[in-house]
Amino acid sequence: MEQFRNIGIIGRLGSSQVLDTIRRLKKFLLERHLHVILEDTIAEVLPGHGLQTSTRKLLGEVCDLVIVVGGDGSLLGAARALARHNIPVLGINRGNLGFLTDIRPDELEEKVAEVLDGHYLVENRFLLQAEVRRHNEAIGQGDALNDVVLHPGKSTRMIEFEIYIDGQFVCSQKADGLIVATPTGSTAYALSAGGPIMHPKLDAIVIVPMYPHTLSGRPIVVDGNSELKIVVSKDLQIYPQVSCDGQNHFTCAPGDTITVSKKPQKLRLIHPLDHNYYEVCRTKLGWGSRLGGRDD
């Protein structure tokens, strides 16, 4: 297994719990004589840290491993910045759900030590890349680990659009919007809209309509290498938005085209050896436990 010597730390701003966890993590890593580099934004709220700092984009060039302290949203942002560097990312959960940041703060030293000693699992999670075009000219681009979402923005009106897959017309729809999600994102917004849960190892994309004005509007799972094209109706009276992971936003105009496809670079997500995807789903989504209360 890969040995990590240069460790980057990214943290969610605005949380004293995150700062406390970063201090613990810093102390633990330095005791192991590792080189620790703080993202510059979190370094600003940690006076006297005494560490090298770096922008998020450059962390991928100077680190062997990046540890994200926060929630899934924090890891989503880090993933988009770091995927192009092919650098492993490990998450310590200081958020709510923790589908991606799966190390609890109370087990920080134990689990991080296991990873540093070479005992870990690596998952390659693919991202989506989206491009908004107007009059055949790109006006916005973004990446997403979870999903690319077409939605009405501040308006309450429905959106009318056409869907094409690999150049073939699929259907037109009137709906509140459309979610295009990866397997990683299938347990996020797409799940709330009635989409299926997809195992992270699946090479597939799910297209989930949001409140379609039809009884036949259902999610569609397509090959992960498909290219999706969404054409906003020219007669639309509103200016909908495209969001990548709910964090990057672009405003569309009637007649615009949104192209969504798999990004060539993948996120290398690190897990402890005892990571169990189904246990995560069972815990986070409230699935039923073993009959009779057995834990074997």
UniProtKB/Swiss-Prot annotation:
Catalytic residues as annotated in Swiss-Prot or TrEMBL: D72
GO molecular function: ATP binding; metal ion binding; NAD binding; NAD+ kinase activity
Domain of life: Bacteria
Reaction catalysis annotation: NAD(+) + ATP = ADP + NADP(+) + H(+)
Principal subcellular localisation of the protein: cytoplasm
EC numbers, comma separated: 2.7.1.23
Keyword Membrane: no
Gene3D superfamilies on file: Probable inorganic polyphosphate/atp-NAD kinase, domain 1, Probable inorganic polyphosphate/atp-NAD kinase, domain 2
Location of the protein in the cell: Cytoplasm
Annotated positions binding NAD(+): D72, G73, N146, D147, R157, K174, D176, T187, A188, Y189, A190, L191, S192, Q247
GO process terms (BP): NAD metabolic process; NADP biosynthetic process
Keyword DNA-binding: no
Keyword terms: ATP-binding, Cytoplasm, Kinase, NAD, NADP, Nucleotide-binding, Transferase
Listed GO CC annotations: cytoplasm
The protein's required cofactors: a divalent metal cation
Alphabetical list of PANTHER family matching this protein: NAD KINASE
HAMAP family: NAD_kinase (MF_00361)
Known role: Involved in the regulation of the intracellular balance of NAD and NADP, and is a key enzyme in the biosynthesis of NADP. Catalyzes specifically the phosphorylation on 2'-hydroxyl of the adenosine moiety of NAD to yield NADP.
NCBIfam families named among the record's database cross-references: PRK01231.1
Sequence similarity: Belongs to the NAD kinase family.
Name recorded for this polypeptide: NAD kinase
Organism for this UniProt entry: Pseudomonas entomophila (strain L48)
Gene: nadK
